From Swiss-Prot:
Membrane disposition: Multi-pass membrane protein
Tree of life domain: Bacteria
Family the UniProt entry places it in: Belongs to the UbiA prenyltransferase family. Protoheme IX farnesyltransferase subfamily.
Record's protein name: Protoheme IX farnesyltransferase
Length: 295
């Protein structure tokens, strides 16, 4: 039974989000790490993300039955009752928000609430099923964890937090569209209006390319704004150029699914590399940052 309750929280998604939380937290800490705050923030975000995933599993159990990738999920197979999952999700959420409020700060908690509401209330309940823009809305909730990590330290939503929000939101788009391409038949069978299904894969490729360009610009802003150093800048530029090259090669490939899967895998490599580099190559913003000259 423990295994089922763990699976329904989507541990892989929790782990991926924690990497970005750590990146945002350490970027803001700039070498002066408050370890109790670090632990409370990680635990709080983990529980909130877990809660959102359980609610998502509850909401999506009808369409999950139609998709090859999700047909064996815990709620689809009836290993946990829908009622029990709702109680479980609620308890996880309450615990997570309380940890963020009392262990971090109210701003971190409210950011968690906003990300949660967007993911569960706006994306899962409505946009995912009814709009081609569901991915765009969902990207905002996916970008919340690193911003929470950052604001847990600063207690302020400054330009650094805004840049993180932009980076991770823009990253979500090609990442998600790549999944929709190599899982095209699943989304089609479940009648989920993702861009590749509604507008076609060729249109999705155009969007992927444009979003990666925007992502590349956003990643550079951390260094230009004086928040991250030049080692981060080099890595950010390198992964962005490589990812963009992969996207452009998509116009000539014979097998879109193979290409999309490779693009998806590299997206994880890219965001992990950026999270690591912003953790270790931070700077204290000052008047010498390039952005200071245009303020």
């Amino acid at each position: 039974m423990f295994k089922q309750y763990l699976q329904v929280t989507k541990p892989g998604i929790i782990f991926g989000n924690l990497i970005s939380v750590i990146g945002g937290f350490l970027l803001a800490s700039k070498g002066h790490i408050d370890y109790p705050l670090f632990v409370w923030t990680l635990l709080g975000v983990s529980l909130v993300v877990a809660s959102g995933c359980v609610f998502n599993n509850y909401i999506d159990r009808d369409i999950d039955r139609k998709m090859e990738r999700t047909k064996n999920r815990v709620l689809v197979k009836g290993l946990i009752s829908p009622e029990a999952s709702l109680v479980y999700a609620t308890l996880l959420g309450i615990a997570g928000f309380m940890l963020l409020w009392f262990g971090a700060n109210p701003l971190a908690c409210w950011l968690g609430v906003m990300g949660f509401v967007v993911y569960v209330g706006v994306y899962s309940l409505y946009m995912k099923r009814h709009s081609v823009y569901g991915t765009l809305i969902g990207s905002l909730s996916g970008a919340a964890p690193p911003v929470i990590g950052y604001c847990a330290v600063t207690g302020d939503f400054d330009s650094g937090a805004a840049i993180l929000l932009a980076i991770f939101s823009l990253w979500q788009m090609p990442h998600s569209y790549a999944i929709a391409i190599f899982r095209f038949k699943d989304y089609q069978a479940a009648n989920i209006p993702v861009l590749p299904v509604v507008k076609g894969i060729s249109v999705a490729k155009n969007h992927i390319t444009l979003y990666i360009v925007a992502f590349a610009v956003a990643t550079l802003m951390l260094s230009l704004g004086g928040y991250a150093g030049y080692k981060y800048l080099v890595v950010a530029a390198a992964v962005s150029v490589w990812w963009l090259g992969m996207a452009l090669r998509g116009y000539k490939v014979a097998d879109d699914k193979v290409w999309a899967r490779k693009l998806f895998v590299f997206s994880i490599v890219a965001i992990t590399a950026l999270s690591v580099m912003m953790s270790v190559d931070f700077m204290v913003p000052d008047s010498h940052s390039l952005l200071a000259y245009v303020r």
